[in-house]
Regions:
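Eukaryotic scaffold repeat domains enriched in small/polar residues
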Residues: 15-240
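Sec-dependent bacterial lipoprotein signal peptides
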Residues: 1-13
């Protein structure tokens, strides 16, 4: 790692013929090295040199842990892409445009939510996110790309598509206390909403416009939201 840092510093110096001031600062035990060049810092940790370690028990991060054995009937089989566990349900979002599956907390298969296709209540593109709203008995889907949010009841039956005035790309969704939906996605144009709040009729209630720094150029990035802090946390790889 230290050799890589030295090579990187050499490359930085070679890329620009203007004078640069650089210095190397090391931690007391030698495991961490910070290379500063013209006001920019690169920190490298050499794990082989770390002498002072601590053990962090899993209980520091996890309150409860259980093993769920899923039903093994043919209709219950899935290839999980993402798993969404709520107080009463476990939702399985599959890749390759496969149908979304809903289980109870004991692994019993309940329903397919919607179906693959281009008709009412169907989706013909890969689902990018879902939100299970147990309080109001709804399930919402956002497509990989599109101009709608799909709304179902908790039994997997389609209610309606919520129309949107703009295209959403790789959108993540969250249900607020008032029943409105918060959405974060990847905007391609400055001024388009980066994040917005919408009601179930498709009316935009609030929005945060994208700036030159928060728009994206392609679909290479991702938006992640793990919902493990009781709020709508997200990580936008294109801008974070």
């Amino acid at each position: 790692l230290l050799l890589s840092s030295a090579l990187l510093l050499g490359c930085l110096s070679a890329c620009n013929t203007s004078p640069r001031e650089s210095k190397v600062m090391e931690a007391n035990d030698g495991s961490v090295t910070t290379i500063e060049s013209n006001g920019n810092k690169l920190t490298v940790c050499d794990l082989s040199a770390v002498k002072d370690t601590i053990e962090v028990p899993l209980s520091e991060f996890v309150e409860d842990c259980r093993i769920v054995r899923f039903e093994t009937s043919e209709e219950a089989y899935f290839k999980a892409w993402f798993i969404n566990a709520t107080d009463k349900h476990i939702g399985i979002r599959q890749g390759n445009q496969d149908v979304f599956k809903l289980f109870d907390r004991d692994g019993k298969f309940l329903y397919n939510v919607g179906s693959v296709g281009s008709g009412p209540g169907e989706y013909d593109t890969t689902l990018y996110d879902e939100c299970i709203d147990e309080k109001n008995g709804h399930i919402f889907f956002t497509p990989f790309v599109g101009k709608r949010i799909m709304m179902y009841d908790i039994n997997g039956q389609w209610i309606k598509d919520i129309p949107l005035p703009m295209q959403i790309n790789k959108a993540k969704i969250w249900v607020n206390e008032d029943g409105s939906l918060s959405v974060v996605h990847m905007p391609f144009e400055e001024g388009e909403p980066l994040a917005f709040r919408v009601d179930t009729e498709g009316n935009i209630l609030n929005q945060i416009p994208a700036t030159a720094a928060t728009k994206v150029m392609n679909f290479d990035g991702e938006v992640f939201s793990y919902r493990n802090c009781g709020d709508f946390d997200f990580f936008h790889t294109g801008i974070d």
